[in-house]
Amino acid sequence: MSRLVVVSNRIALPDDKKSSAGGLAVGILGALRAAGGLWFGWSGEIGDDQQPLKQVSRGNISWASFNLNERDHDEYYNQFSNAVLWPAFHYRLDLVSFQREAWEGYLRVNAMLADKLLPLIEPDDTLWIHDYHLLPFASELRKRGVNNRIGFFLHIPFPTPEIFNALPPHAELLEQLCDYDLLGFQTESDRTAFLDSIAMQTRLSDLGDKRYQAWGKAFSTEVYPIGIDPDEITRNAKGPLPPKLAQLKNELKNVKNIFSVERLDYSKGLPERFLAYETLLEKYPQHHGKIRYTQIAPTSRGDVQAYQDIRHQLETAAGRINGQFGQLGWTPLYYLNQHFDRKLLMKVFRYSDVGLVTPLRDGMNLVAKEYVAAQDPDNPGVLVLSQFAGAAQELTSALIVNPYDRDEVAAALDRALSMPLAERIARHSAMLDVIRENDIHNWQARFVEDLQHISPRSEESRLRGKIATFPKLA
């Protein structure tokens, strides 16, 4: 079996307890343990980028990390990945700030990373590249003569052609993506949007079985909805409560708890969510004094104006809601702008009556799946989920809502708060079955297996691809 090489913007080093706590690290480490291999990525440190790679080994897995200098980090990470690709891929062209220097820096860093990885690649290695920071990475490796199998998984949404093609370097990015052998997406709509974007730029040939050719390059596409480890979530949720959390649970025994947690980001729909909760209190006064909504939203990218604006909106809305509806002994909304331990959050999920997950756009949203997995199957809570989260394609037994429609969200919350036990159990059971079937281990195993079934590119096919590249005819 060939060795697996995983490349991501950040890596979870074996000695970093925080980074290895869960999420993507669980799936990647499972794949690496199965095949043996290397995890390559940025150390998270800004410093001397000329230092040798920091390499660590544990069993059959090695980690290799590098530093970025301040200019590269700013142009590649801040200005292009997060100020151009992130907002555009989340349908927020109004927040895109394109600068030619940042685009050049993005390409420069991808080329530099290819140079750093090249000496570590063995002839039979299978490469798996992750997310929007590394869209051109396969193209840079191909330029350096790498013909290994290279797969790519996009964790965030892929926007419609009307959005994607508004990006100045859209054609270059699409052609670079075609240098991957396998491109994986969270949903079928993401996969379709990618192919439609190509078809608007050049001839797209359907080779059958979700395999295509464009710009003389053949590639496969597939949908791989990322999952979680439900057993790990259940273990963490069922454990004993810390004293402060036990006290809080006791205080809430006569109040139904609506709970949400995600980082502070404009894609998560937090201002719209606060307005929907305000509508619930206005239209359904029977819940006054009997419910509490807790929103945890730790700051991310706090130096960016768009994120500062959201924080101000939330603080203003929370004050208004509590001022208008609060009573002595009852605060309807708790807004916490701080980080909490992930294992602790699983316990909070378990005693929350409603999980409110309403992003405006999200590739998958694992919080929705974690909430379901954390529930007591004999007395589960209800998930209220945005139709624009990738998870809505799988968790169809949730209460699916349009996050832009505050009345619809408020009505769903009212329904969730009064849902009979039998219906709650049936909905939870159906969602948990899906989560177990498409867990994080199945996700990585499917992707790696599909990638390894693709024949590696030969030098001849690479040259043919160059010869076959023609401009699109008008």
From Swiss-Prot:
* Reaction(s) the record says it catalyses: D-glucose 6-phosphate + UDP-alpha-D-glucose = alpha,alpha-trehalose 6-phosphate + UDP + H(+)
Q: Where is this site: Involved in alpha anomer selectivity?
A: 86, 156
| Main EC class the enzyme belongs to | transferase
| Annotated keywords | Glycosyltransferase, Transferase
The Swiss-Prot or TrEMBL record annotates one GO molecular function as: alpha,alpha-trehalose-phosphate synthase (UDP-forming) activity
Metabolic or biological pathway: Glycan biosynthesis; trehalose biosynthesis
Q: Which Pfam families match?
A: Glyco_transf_20
Residues annotated to bind UDP-alpha-D-glucose: 22-23, 263, 268, 340, 366-370
Q: Detail which positions bind D-glucose 6-phosphate.
A: 10, 77, 131, 301
UniProt subunit comment: Homotetramer.
Q: What does this protein do?
A: Probably involved in the osmoprotection via the biosynthesis of trehalose. Catalyzes the transfer of glucose from UDP-alpha-D-glucose (UDP-Glc) to D-glucose 6-phosphate (Glc-6-P) to form trehalose-6-phosphate. Acts with retention of the anomeric configuration of the UDP-sugar donor.
What family does the database annotate? Answer: Belongs to the glycosyltransferase 20 family.
For this entry, the protein name equals: Trehalose-6-phosphate synthase
Annotated organism of origin:
Klebsiella pneumoniae subsp. pneumoniae (strain ATCC 700721 / MGH 78578)
